């Protein structure tokens, strides 16, 4: 044990993974960190393996993916692991953010951890979009065309930026090459950000807990207690992931992407992957192109303002009935946006999307501050002598 505490590298591992004192009362909702680290590890290993057989060329990209599926030993397994773990990654990140919002993990002194987490979400979305373009099916081509064209909404220089991203006048070889290079690079940036996220949490006050109070009264070392606890959810995760990979690998994908990209034929509906749908719905609900793009990016960055707009004296919503109702309405609204993002742009989905978009932003900028002030007043009234 002595080398663990004296070796310059091992003592860092020891302080984070072995001796790290965790609050004794943290629930399974605090297990997402290990699951997300596992997802990132799977994505990097399977991604590097796929890159060994992939060709980033307009003529060969689709065929190289088919070659991986048919000719490479267990290539189908590597590809389906990569695709389905991406979905699992986002599902767990959304749960992780939901837990953070519920238990007030964004409040001081964890504000930096929360800000880095929001940057991680943005980088994840960029990485996922770049990866979705690479198989070069119909949805890849048209998704890339639509999303990169958003840059043309920027006044004066927009069209130049789009052509700079494409490396030409449409999605072509240069586009696929640069998307492949960036898609390969960004997971390593993600790993660095995840490390920063961990350091920011570890070097302030450590993990929060379901009571929202200081955890210093009762703590346990990370090993073996929380390692075993993490293993429980890791095994459950592998079981669920295996069900998707082996029995329904394309359940979360789009059948249109099994059709080779054809610039002369537009698919019936251009829809991104399910985990980007809520933000796509916000983009589409605003008729003005520039305002739609601003709203879509603001929807992600709105998470950053939570430490400022939540004026409550209590951490988390577990003991605040009004905030709890507001939180569950927000979650339901997010799921509604996810559904609307997959629908055609027609009545009543346009109107529903606009209502949901207003409600989404109102939650961060109006509902949270107003409700927290009301609850502060009620607490003061109740505790006044």
Curated annotation (Swiss-Prot):
Pfam families: Cytochrom_B_C, Cytochrome_B
Gene Ontology BP terms: mitochondrial electron transport, ubiquinol to cytochrome c
Descriptive protein name: Cytochrome b
Assembly with partners or alone: Fungal cytochrome b-c1 complex contains 10 subunits; 3 respiratory subunits, 2 core proteins and 5 low-molecular weight proteins. Cytochrome b-c1 complex is a homodimer.
Family the UniProt entry places it in: Belongs to the cytochrome b family.
Binding residues annotated for heme b b562, in chain numbering: 82, 183
UniProt cofactor note: Binds 2 heme b groups non-covalently.
Subcellular location: Mitochondrion inner membrane
PROSITE patterns registered for this protein in UniProt: CYTB_CTER, CYTB_NTER
Major location category of this protein: mitochondrion
Membrane topology (UniProt): Multi-pass membrane protein
Binding site for heme b b566: 96, 197
Cofactor(s), by name: heme b
A single Gene Ontology CC term: respiratory chain complex III
Described purpose of this protein according to its UniProt entry: Component of the ubiquinol-cytochrome c reductase complex (complex III or cytochrome b-c1 complex) that is part of the mitochondrial respiratory chain. The b-c1 complex mediates electron transfer from ubiquinol to cytochrome c. Contributes to the generation of a proton gradient across the mitochondrial membrane that is then used for ATP synthesis.
Domain of life: Eukaryota
Gene Ontology molecular function, alphabetical: metal ion binding; ubiquinol-cytochrome-c reductase activity
Binding site for a ubiquinone: 202
Keywords: Electron transport, Heme, Iron, Membrane, Metal-binding, Mitochondrion, Mitochondrion inner membrane, Respiratory chain, Transmembrane, Transmembrane helix, Transport, Ubiquinone
Note: Heme 1 (or BL or b562) is low-potential and absorbs at about 562 nm, and heme 2 (or BH or b566) is high-potential and absorbs at about 566 nm.
Transmembrane segments: 32-52, 76-98, 113-133, 179-199, 226-246, 290-310, 322-342, 349-369
